[in-house]
Amino acid sequence: MSLLTIHPESGTSAPEIIREGDAIAARLAEIGVLFERWQAGRAFEPDAEQQTILAAYADSVERLKAKYGFESADVISVGPDHPQKDELRARFLREHTHSDFEVRFFVEGRGLFYLHPGDRVYAILCERGDLLSVPSNTRHWFDMGAEPCLKCIRLFTTAEGWVADFTGSDIGDRFPRLEDYLKHYA
């Protein structure tokens, strides 16, 4: 189940909790973020190649490319046995921005996005079928969990793909990791 919690950036008071998909989409639209529920009915082997996953969703990827001018797409696929899962998690947990507009479509698994526009932090638990945009220059971080299980198509407006500009902030340390978030809010 997708979930949105909205926190003051201090992280010191109880958040607003939103569980219904249309309400999540409406609140995120207020900050320029697209949230949609898509069909993600295809099953993949744990070691499925990026091209296999992109080919399975080629029509959807092409529609998004045409609509938003995306130049590239890739797949982040991380399971509990991934040899670099700890390094990837540590990198994604650091607050950063991107100079381009990006979209994420979860085709398997889940992950926790934190968006930090202004003085609020929006935590979005994304699961299979969720599509989420990250507007350009929006401070954010992502937690895939200690035992990740996700396949996510990422679309970029630049050919370079995922290029992060890390802010140097430790704000991510003040908010719960995926496992604690699930215990408290899910």
From Swiss-Prot:
Broadest EC class assigned to this enzyme = oxidoreductase
Give start-end of the signal peptide. Answer: none
Q: How is the cofactor bound?
A: Binds 1 Fe(2+) cation per monomer.
Q: Which reaction does it catalyse?
A: 1,2-dihydroxy-5-(methylsulfanyl)pent-1-en-3-one + O2 = 3-(methylsulfanyl)propanoate + CO + formate + 2 H(+); 1,2-dihydroxy-5-(methylsulfanyl)pent-1-en-3-one + O2 = 4-methylsulfanyl-2-oxobutanoate + formate + 2 H(+)
Question: What keywords would UniProt list here?
Answer: Amino-acid biosynthesis, Dioxygenase, Iron, Metal-binding, Methionine biosynthesis, Nickel, Oxidoreductase
What residues does the record give for site: Important to generate the dianion? R104
Q: Kindly list the biological process annotations in GO that this record carries.
A: L-methionine salvage from methylthioadenosine; L-methionine salvage from S-adenosylmethionine
- Tell me its EC number(s), please: 1.13.11.54, 1.13.11.53
Which residues are Ni(2+)-binding? H96, H98, E102, H140
UniProt xrefs under InterPro entries = ARD (IPR004313), ARD_bac (IPR023956), RmlC-like_jellyroll (IPR014710), RmlC_Cupin_sf (IPR011051)
Per the record, the domain of life is Bacteria
Question: Which residues does the UniProt site feature May play a role in metal incorporation in vivo point to?
Answer: E95
Please list the GO terms describing molecular function: acireductone dioxygenase (Ni2+-requiring) activity; acireductone dioxygenase [iron(II)-requiring] activity; iron ion binding; nickel cation binding
Q: Which Gene3D superfamilies match?
A: Jelly Rolls
Pathway this chain belongs to: Amino-acid biosynthesis; L-methionine biosynthesis via salvage pathway; L-methionine from S-methyl-5-thio-alpha-D-ribose 1-phosphate: step 5/6
Entry cofactors: Fe(2+); Ni(2+)
The function of this protein is: Catalyzes 2 different reactions between oxygen and the acireductone 1,2-dihydroxy-3-keto-5-methylthiopentene (DHK-MTPene) depending upon the metal bound in the active site. Fe-containing acireductone dioxygenase (Fe-ARD) produces formate and 2-keto-4-methylthiobutyrate (KMTB), the alpha-ketoacid precursor of methionine in the methionine recycle pathway. Ni-containing acireductone dioxygenase (Ni-ARD) produces methylthiopropionate, carbon monoxide and formate, and does not lie on the methionine recycle pathway.
Regarding protein family, the annotation reads: Belongs to the acireductone dioxygenase (ARD) family.
Note the subunit structure.
Answer: Monomer.
What is the name of this protein?
A: Acireductone dioxygenase
Organism source for this protein? Methylococcus capsulatus (strain ATCC 33009 / NCIMB 11132 / Bath)
Organism classification, top ranks?
Bacteria, Pseudomonadati, Pseudomonadota, Gammaproteobacteria, Methylococcales
Gene that encodes it: mtnD
